[in-house]
């Protein structure tokens, strides 16, 4: 039994012996190298890398440009037009077939939308408006061109 007692005492502590647990000091783990992340930018055409802070031109990238032609019949359709603008699509709105009050409300709603998005709204004809997001630039004016060519 002497061997079995030794075996027991080796693996199982006797009740008489006190058990102390020593804390092992951990060595700090080496830090992993940070990966480069792009910072969010208001301008969609440039990406700034975190570590190097270099500006990378994205002018070579192709963005699909879409234009939406809309002729809303009720004010409730204005939200759908705003969603197109949020998706960076140009919207041409023909308000000739809607009441004056409804047309005014739609223009007011779209004016607020393009202001919030940093875009622009322009009148291009009788009750026809061009709404553009911030990534579209419009030069000139149709009424100025018509005056110059004596079409009016």
Curated annotation (Swiss-Prot):
The record, for Pfam families, names:
SepF
Q: Has the keyword Iron-sulfur been applied to this entry?
A: no
Basic and acidic residues: bias regions:
23-32
Q: What is its main location?
A: cytoplasm
Q: Per the record, which residues fall in region Disordered?
A: 23-42
Q: What is any one GO biological process for this UniProt entry?
A: FtsZ-dependent cytokinesis
* Residues spanning the membrane: none
This protein's UniProt keywords: Cell cycle, Cell division, Cytoplasm, Septation
Q: Out of the domains of life, which is the source?
A: Bacteria
- Keyword ATP-binding set for record: no
List the GO terms this entry assigns under cellular component, sorted alphabetically: cytoplasm
Coiled-coil residue windows: none
Checking Gene3D superfamilies in the record gives: SepF-like protein
Instruction: State where the protein is found.
Output: Cytoplasm
Q: Which family does it belong to?
A: Belongs to the SepF family.
Query: How does this protein assemble?
Result: Homodimer. Interacts with FtsZ.
Q: What does this protein do?
A: Cell division protein that is part of the divisome complex and is recruited early to the Z-ring. Probably stimulates Z-ring formation, perhaps through the cross-linking of FtsZ protofilaments. Its function overlaps with FtsA.
Name by which UniProt lists this protein: Cell division protein SepF
What organism, scientifically named, is this protein from? Listeria innocua serovar 6a (strain ATCC BAA-680 / CLIP 11262)
């Amino acid at each position: 039994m002497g061997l079995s007692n030794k075996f027991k005492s080796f693996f199982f502590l006797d009740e008489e012996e006190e058990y102390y647990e020593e804390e092992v000091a951990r060595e700090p783990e080496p830090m992993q190298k940070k990966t480069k992340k792009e910072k969010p930018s208001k301008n969609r055409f440039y990406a700034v890398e975190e570590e190097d802070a270099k500006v990378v031109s994205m002018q070579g990238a192709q963005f699909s440009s879409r234009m939406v032609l809309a002729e809303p019949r009720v004010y409730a359709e204005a939200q759908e037009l705003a969603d197109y603008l949020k998706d960076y699509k140009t919207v041409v709105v023909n308000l000739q077939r809607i009441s004056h009050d409804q047309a005014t409300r739609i223009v007011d709603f779209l004016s607020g939308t393009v202001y919030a998005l940093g875009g622009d709204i322009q009148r291009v004809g009788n009750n026809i408006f061009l709404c553009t997001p911030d990534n579209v630039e419009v030069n000139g004016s149709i009424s100025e061109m018509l005056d110059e060519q004596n079409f009016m």
